[in-house]
Amino acid sequence: MNKKTIVVKFGTSTLTQGSPKLNSPHMMEIVRQIAQLHNDGFRIVIVTSGAIAAGRHYLNHPQLPPTIASKQLLAAVGQSQLIQAWEKLFAIYDIHIGQLLLTRADIEDRERFLNARDTLHALLDNHIIPVINENDAVATAEIKVGDNDNLSALVAILVQAEQLYLLTDQQGLFDSDPRKNPEAKLIPVVEQITDHIRSIAGGSGTNLGTGGMMTKIIAADVATRSGIETIIAPGNRPNVIADLAYEQNIGTKFIAHQSDRLESRKQWLFAAPSAGIITIDDGAKNAILEQNKSLLPAGIINVEGRFSRGEVVKICTQSGKDIVLGMPRYNSDALQLIKGRKSADIENVLGYEYGAVAMHRDDMIILS
């Protein structure tokens, strides 16, 4: 079975098909494709816009002032309508979904990042499709052009996706605005996002959503720099999601920088000063440096500093040499209690557990 992880972002224009409300027949077709891929073994994550449009329709298009508070009102009302629409359609295929409402702060904060990542992986590991939206009802600065485009790129990094699909009402990126120039040509492949590519991206799209082509270019830049292939494609093309998953050439493909895949992610994760030091024994040092293993509690000798789960800390040897920069799965107080113990003892000692490792290999940068 193909275990490729794909994040699919649906803009408001894709879900409404130009109407003032969610287009149920089109959403049904979207769900059919995702259900097919889900059953074929793909791991699919949905990032969905549409809450504000759904709220506006549910309230019968109220006359509201063009303020942040009005958008938050519509988002608060519409979010429940949006998730119900997804839930009912996936239920036809006996597929469960799990809702996450995120803001950029949830991903930039180290501990909340780890919690969000663990939740997403738990959902995927249990064959539940995550459905993610920006938490527009409480976010202020985030309700602006590009929130869910950028969010989808960060989610793709979060779940270590191979691909990100940005589905929109356009065929892809053109060399000029196709709505103004009938001679505009589709750009099928972008090897690198240059100033020229940015200059032809244009402005915002529809008035129902908050995203435009430029925000998709920014999202593609974030994703490809982290080794994630990104495709801008037409959301109304028949079978577009399944065809993309099976490598058909549709829309505009942004080539991922695969050589920088892991390092890019880690640069993004670890741009912070060290909050503490974990000293380990020689066995743990050899396991990390020579066998590419994670750090187990049994290998920890000492913990210095006060830090939260997910903050950046150093791992050093008994001689004091720094060998790793990384994010622990447990805070400093918990590590003090479980250091030197077997992983099987974690839950008995703490009353909870975030897994068998103190720091996962994926959350480490090797310094030496």
From Swiss-Prot:
Its main location: cytoplasm. Substrate binds at residues 49, 136, 148. This is Glutamate 5-kinase. It catalyses: L-glutamate + ATP = L-glutamyl 5-phosphate + ADP. The lineage of its organism: Bacteria, Pseudomonadati, Pseudomonadota, Gammaproteobacteria, Pasteurellales. GO terms for biological process: L-proline biosynthetic process. It comes from Haemophilus influenzae (strain 86-028NP). Belongs to the glutamate 5-kinase family. Pathway: Amino-acid biosynthesis; L-proline biosynthesis; L-glutamate 5-semialdehyde from L-glutamate: step 1/2. SUPFAM superfamilies: Carbamate kinase-like, PUA domain-like. The gene is proB. It is found in: Cytoplasm. ATP binds at residues 9, 168-169, 210-216. Catalyzes the transfer of a phosphate group to glutamate to form L-glutamate 5-phosphate.
